[in-house]
Amino acid sequence: MLGTVEGDLHDIGKNLVGMMLGSNGFNVVDAGVDVTAASFVSAAKESNADIIALSGLLTTTMIYFPVVIEALGKAGLKDKVKVMIGGAPVSRAYADEIGAEGFAEDCASAVDEATRLMTLVTKSI
C-alpha cells in the first residue's frame, strides 16, 4: 500500500513506484495524495497491507512521516506492517530516525527494498 503524506499533493514519484511494484508482482493499493495518518491506518487495515510506502516531495510535509508511524503503533499495526519511505527530502538516516524499516531513493530501488521488507513481514494469525 502506498500514498503521499498529508499536505503533499505530488504524485508522480508515488505513481512510478506503484507501477514498478505492480509490474514486479506486488499487489498495490494506492491511497492517493494528501493522505492523513488516520486514512493510512484505515487503508492498511482494509487492504491487509504488508508494507506501507510513504511518499513526500515537500520538506514541509516531512513531519507527517513519523505521525503515520506513530498512528500505526497506536492502532496495533506497527508489528504487522513494514514502513518504507521515499521522496526528495528524505534519506536512509531519516528513515532510521523515525523508525521506518525501509527507504528507497528511486522507483527501481523501491522494488528491491520492498522485496527485502517482505522477508521481514510477520503476520499474526
Residue spans for each PLM region:
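Long amphipathic N-terminal alpha/beta scaffold segment
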Residues: M1-G13
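A charged, well-structured terminal subsegment
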Residues: V111-I125
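Cofactor-cradling patches in redox/metallo enzymes
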Residues: K14-N24, V29-A100, S109, E113
